[in-house]
């Protein structure tokens, strides 16, 4: 017998589209078999009906032959021979009737009954298991949808536990029903062969027994053939029993796995994450926009193929291209209060698709895999080794810390070297750029820690700056909170969110800011850090001040003369950063870069900083100051008007822009 195709029980839990596609082939085969079995049963019942009719007909014939004697023929003389002959024929017909009756009974037991049992037992079982599998799959999809909607923040642990148990129960139920369904379909491939041959064996045996007295030669030839067929059926029966035992043992082993196999995100604290993947596959939730403000999430099967991200819905024969991953960027994002979301951005900076994984492990592995693929590692001779090396370097460079003191302690001595390539020692506005782009190691030392918290908390800075001042219990600021701002010609405020800061080795080029942006964003993506501190950045002609929007207390203050470099991101216009030169107690100076995300364009913040530096320069020359004041419009109170109050086109709330760019 040729090998029989079968469904792999090990793939039942994953429930991939490939398995579903193969399952549909088995289901189509079962449907075809059901239709054919019904037609075959009708034909066999017709034969059985004809045989029963033959029994009734021969019985009636025998009676009718005997009835000849009782007929009152007008010319009935000489009928005794006929009557005796008919009596003999009646006995022959009675004997023949016995043979037909025996044949009819044998056809019912060996031909019709097996095919009816096959239809009512095996085919009905497959149909019932199919319905149960469909119900279990629907319950699992509903529970996964409910689990996916769990909020990320302030979530009820009891609800989370209950939903997790519900997902595990639904997944276990789907696994059990799929295993039973797969086993039934696999066994059906054997049983259908037996079901087709066993009835015909019974039919043939019945006919042979019926004609045995007059067909010894024929029966001998048929006996040899039927013997071989019976041996084949017996061998199939042996194979079925062995396969059934094998599937039973395999089913028990698969059902005895740890409970964590069914529970999503089972190891939240310390999942085993493989950051060296160059290919990945699994189910993700895809965010689709259905209107101006409405979205839907669809659970689909995604997999990578070379440098492409593919998607394959259930029932589809093959996957389709969703995103070209070459030179793309990926990072974790907050989206609609859902957990484990990440966004793929195209090389031109446009936002791509947003996907949601079912666990932290899956989320980080997808991010790492896409990040590896985007670097075209898969084209190298040994992509796994390249991925391991790159991720080791990245982890060393982006180890996060949240203590400003630790950051200063771990800074390398090379970060405190004073740069000698400034245009002059009076802190010119724009440092002189180098002739060629420096390497990343020349800008930032490998392994430099990144600080994700703001420099000082608001309460600590309040105690340091205000001393014994009375604290307003209502959080309102005092009029004299920032006395130096009242005397400043320049006052401009922006809404910013702090992304991170790190020590740098040089401030001779803006490339150091771009490299710091890259490392900070990469660190946030790798370590799954979403939290950002929002502040008001006030730019004056003396300083840059970060103000708590709730308490109006200054979080950090940088002298404008200590700002040696500032730049906005070339593609993401809302990213802005600046380099601060701070003197150390040892007499040397340290350089640190600070990265922010702004509600407005970063170029506007850079323009304000640049103007503040110009004011510092021209304040030494009254004539130059007068020319500068004439060249720039002023407000009624004599402050500089830097920016209009019109919102950007790509922001939805004008009030946010007026708040972000209002004058203090």
Swiss-Prot record:
- Subcellular location field: Early endosome membrane; Nucleus; Cell membrane; Endosome membrane
Q: Where would I find the PID domain in this sequence?
A: 488-637
Q: Give every BAR domain span.
A: 3-268
- One GO CC annotation: extracellular exosome
Annotated stretches, region: Required for RAB5A binding = 1-428
Q: Where is this site: Breakpoint for chromosomal translocation?
A: 234-235
The Basic and acidic residues compositionally biased stretches are 654-664
UniProt keywords (A-Z) are: Cell cycle, Cell membrane, Cell projection, Chromosomal rearrangement, Cytoplasm, Cytoplasmic vesicle, Endosome, Membrane, Nucleus
Region entry Disordered: which residue ranges?
A: 643-664
Tissue specificity as recorded in UniProt: High levels in brain, heart, kidney and skeletal muscle.
Q: Name one GO biological process term.
A: regulation of innate immune response
* PH domain ranges (all copies): 277-375
Principal location class: membrane
The question of whether Membrane is a record keyword is answered with: yes
Residues in coiled coil: none
Single annotated GO MF: phosphatidylinositol binding
- CDD domains in UniProt: BAR-PH_APPL, BAR_APPL2, PTB_APPL
Record comment regarding domains:
The BAR domain is necessary and sufficient for mediating homotypic and heterotypic interactions; associates with cytoplasmic membrane structures; mediates interaction with TBC1D1 and ADIPOR1. The PH and PID domains mediate phosphoinositide binding. The PID domain mediates phosphatidylserine binding and allows localization to cytosolic membrane structures and nucleus. The PH domain allows localization to the plasma membrane, cytosolic vesicles and distinct nuclear and perinuclear structures and is sufficient for RUVBL2 interaction.
Its biological purpose is as follows: Multifunctional adapter protein that binds to various membrane receptors, nuclear factors and signaling proteins to regulate many processes, such as cell proliferation, immune response, endosomal trafficking and cell metabolism. Regulates signaling pathway leading to cell proliferation through interaction with RAB5A and subunits of the NuRD/MeCP1 complex. Plays a role in immune response by modulating phagocytosis, inflammatory and innate immune responses.
Q: Which disease is it linked to?
A: A chromosomal aberration involving APPL2/DIP13B is found in patients with chromosome 22q13.3 deletion syndrome. Translocation t(12;22)(q24.1;q13.3) with SHANK3/PSAP2.
Q: How does it assemble?
A: Homodimer. Homotetramer. Binds RAB5A/Rab5 through an N-terminal domain. This interaction is essential for its recruitment to endosomal membranes as well as its role in cell proliferation. Binds subunits of the NuRD/MeCP1 complex. Interacts with FSHR; interaction is independent of follicle stimulating hormone stimulation. Interacts with APPL1; the interaction is decreased by adiponectin in a time-dependent manner.
| Protein's UniProt name | DCC-interacting protein 13-beta
Please report the organism this UniProt entry assigns to the protein.
Homo sapiens (Human)
Show the taxonomic lineage: Eukaryota, Metazoa, Chordata, Craniata, Vertebrata
Gene that encodes it: APPL2
């Amino acid at each position: 017998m040729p090998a029989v195709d079968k469904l792999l029980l090990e793939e039942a839990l994953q429930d991939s589209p490939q398995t579903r596609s193969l399952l549909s082939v088995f289901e189509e085969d079962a449907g075809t078999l059901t239709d054919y079995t019904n037609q075959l049963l009708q034909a066999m019942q017709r034969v059985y009906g004809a045989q029963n009719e033959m029994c009734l007909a021969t019985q009636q014939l025998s009676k009718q032959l005997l009835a000849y004697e009782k007929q009152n023929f007008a010319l009935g003389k000489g009928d005794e021979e006929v009557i005796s002959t008919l009596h003999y024929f009646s006995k022959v017909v009675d004997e023949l009737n016995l043979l037909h009756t025996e044949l009819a009974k044998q056809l019912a037991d060996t031909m019709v009954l097996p095919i009816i049992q096959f239809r009512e037992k095996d085919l009905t079982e497959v149909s019932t298991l199919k319905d149960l599998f469909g119900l279990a799959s629907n319950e699992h999809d509903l529970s996964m949808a409910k689990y996916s909607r769990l909020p990320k923040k302030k979530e009820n642990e009891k609800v989370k536990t209950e939903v997790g148990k519900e997902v595990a129960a639904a997944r276990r139920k789907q696994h059990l029903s799929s295993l039973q369904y797969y086993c039934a379909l696999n066994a059906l491939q054997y049983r259908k062969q037996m079901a087709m041959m066993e009835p015909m064996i019974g039919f043939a045996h019945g006919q042979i027994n019926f004609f045995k007295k007059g067909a010894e030669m024929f029966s001998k030839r048929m006996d040899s053939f039927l013997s071989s067929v019976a041996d084949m059926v017996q061998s199939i029966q042996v194979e079925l029993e062995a396969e059934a035992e094998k599937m039973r043992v395999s089913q028990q082993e698969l059902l005895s796995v740890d409970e964590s196999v069914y529970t999503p995100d089972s190891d939240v604290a310390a999942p085993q994450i493989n950051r060296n993947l160059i290919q990945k596959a699994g189910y993700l939730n895809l965010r689709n926009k259905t209107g101006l403000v409405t979205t839907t999430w669809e659970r689909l099967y995604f997999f990578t193929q070379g440098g492409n991200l593919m998607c394959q819905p259930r029932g589809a024969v093959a996957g389709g291209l969703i995103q070209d991953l070459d030179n793309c960027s990926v990072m974790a994002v907050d989206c609609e209060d859902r957990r484990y979301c990440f966004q793929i951005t195209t090389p031109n900076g446009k936002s791509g698709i947003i996907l949601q994984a079912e666990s932290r492990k899956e989320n980080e592995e997808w991010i790492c895999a896409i990040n590896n693929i985007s670097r075209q590692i898969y084209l190298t001779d040994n992509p796994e080794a390249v991925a391991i090396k790159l991720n080791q370097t990245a982890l060393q460079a982006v180890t996060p810390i949240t203590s400003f003191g630790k950051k200063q302690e771990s800074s390398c001595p090379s970060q405190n070297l004073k740069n000698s390539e400034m245009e002059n020692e009076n802190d010119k506005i724009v440092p002189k750029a180098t002739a060629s782009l420096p390497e990343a190691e020349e800008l930032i030392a490998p392994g430099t820690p990144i600080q994700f918290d703001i420099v000082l908390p608001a309460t600590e800075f309040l105690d340091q700056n205000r001393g014994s001042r009375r604290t307003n219990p209502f959080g309102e600021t005092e009029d004299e909170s920032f006395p130096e701002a009242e005397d400043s010609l320049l006052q401009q405020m922006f809404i910013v969110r702090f992304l991170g800061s790190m020590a740098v080795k040089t401030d001779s080029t803006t490339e150091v800011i771009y490299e710091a942006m890259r490392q900070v964003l990469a660190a946030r993506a790798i370590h799954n850090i979403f939290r950002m501190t929002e502040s008001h950045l006030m730019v004056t002609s003396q300083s840059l001040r970060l103000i708590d929007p709730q308490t109006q207390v200054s979080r950090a203050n940088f002298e404008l003369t200590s700002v040696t470099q500032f730049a906005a991101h070339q593609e993401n216009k809302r990213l802005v950063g600046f380099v601060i030169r701070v003197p150390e107690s040892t007499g040397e100076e340290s350089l640190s870069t600070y990265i922010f995300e702004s509600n407005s364009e970063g170029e506007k913040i850079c323009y304000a900083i640049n103007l503040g530096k110009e004011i510092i320069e021209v304040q030494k020359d009254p004539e130059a100051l007068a020319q500068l004041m004439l060249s720039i419009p002023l407000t009624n109170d004599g402050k500089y008007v830097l920016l209009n109050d019109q919102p950007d086109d790509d922001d939805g709330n004008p009030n946010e822009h007026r708040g972000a760019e209002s004058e203090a």
